[in-house]
Amino acid sequence: MTDLHPARTRVAPSPTGDPHVGTAYMALFDKAWAQRTGGQFVLRIEDTDRTRLVADSEDQIYQTLEWLGLSPDESPLVGGPYEPYKQSERLDTYKPLVEKLIESGHAYRCWCSQERLKQLREERAAAKSPETGYDRMCLGMSKEERAKLPGFTETPVVRMLIPEDVDLEFDDLIRGTVRAPRPDDQVILKADGFPTYHMAVVVDDHLMGIDTVVRGEEWISSTPKHLLLYKWLGWEAPKFAHMPLLRNTDKSKISKRKNPAARLMWFREQGYLPEALRNFLQLLAYPTVAEGQEMEDFDSFVSRFDWGNVSTGGPVFDVTKLDWLNGQYIRSLDAEVLTDRVLDYADQMCQARHVLGRDLTQEDRCVIHAAMPLVRERLTLLSEALPKLAFLLTDDDALVFDEDSVAKLKAGADDIQHAAVEVLKGLDDFSADAIQAALRARLCDEMGIKPRLAFAPVRVAVTGSRVSPPLFEAMEILGKESTLRRMQRFEAEIDQK
């Protein structure tokens, strides 16, 4: 069992586009550990790369984490004792510390131009040199001395001076003792005065009291650099937990360029339940609570969470498994609760305008409440409910009869339709049971037609398709007048063919 002193964890995304699903993946384990230990979970915005900032990205980060139930205890939005929580608002914090590193001999200014660095890389590649890092041309030089040599630029960057005896091993909460490759002289302050990730993350984590750093395994190679910065600045280093990377089904790293599911907003747009996605992300790196028991709420997960149980294998992000899990969550919801979730989704996504060509009316909402039990068992996503129920919300005269469904009706469909209309006209009790009993008696018992063939024309007439939610319950919801109007309209249509 890992030490349970109150931990301070953080997730630190960059607002450079749609939030990545990896942000939620890390935030899940950050929040779980903070909650498990009675600590705090912090959201920090790392916006030092000014060239890649995207408008609205920061707001989307707040919205998606809130939607997932992973809201932080401290953030730029809610504040906290360690404000500001945006790196761009902390620039005055970094520069004095960079100067301190220069004065102590742990860092140096570099005036090499981008052209010179590119040439260095090309020459090494041509010579098949194993060297990949900076060649320290500027080390020990003044600006005036460096200006006399080729490839000079007026505004310098600042680089770490990595010692020969740098310790490459460190302890990881998930992986035990880890050995990383030797780092090069990393830039820690850019020419524009902004710190790089490596400098800013160390400074911010220390000053915000972050004692448990949860991040992807791609940062293992950077950890020796970060530990050096902690050492040089005289600070205690945090504990590190390097999570396994999310992988596509072909085992490649999941990315927004190749996989739409890498976009965190995509799950909300598609109609996934946040609790299902959260549960799914948990299962990617943590064992189930019991054999065959995949569904687990967040509080239960928190109560048994320990870093020693996190998997180190590359979890495969298989949306098919998420679809199954989301369907399980949908079917676990009470029909009234599910209806509210469906309507909230439809309102947020303006779905009715795409499905019906208009907004939902109050009458529509009442119909959806009544009809939700008919489709609950058939749903995988919230987005599927409205299209499945659209026939109940369509004007009788506007219902479109699917051509393929009409074409597949067997001979005698017109006779079935005539008989069904006459039976339904005489019904006073228009409940689902009464409708079924009357139609079965006339079409199956008297006319000798098999139920599947007998009810197919009725289904097409009422719903527009051969595939629909339960027919008789749908007819009850439509009511006698609307049902007969549709059936008579369809009767007239097939009479013309």
From Swiss-Prot:
EC number: 6.1.1.17
Record protein name field: Glutamate--tRNA ligase
Cellular-component GO terms for this entry: cytosol
Known function: Catalyzes the attachment of glutamate to tRNA(Glu) in a two-step reaction: glutamate is first activated by ATP to form Glu-AMP and then transferred to the acceptor end of tRNA(Glu).
PROSITE patterns per UniProt: AA_TRNA_LIGASE_I
Position of sequence motif 'KMSKS' region: 253-257
Subunit (UniProt): Monomer.
Enzyme class per UniProt: ligase
MF term (GO), any: tRNA binding
Family: Belongs to the class-I aminoacyl-tRNA synthetase family. Glutamate--tRNA ligase type 1 subfamily.
Annotated localization: Cytoplasm
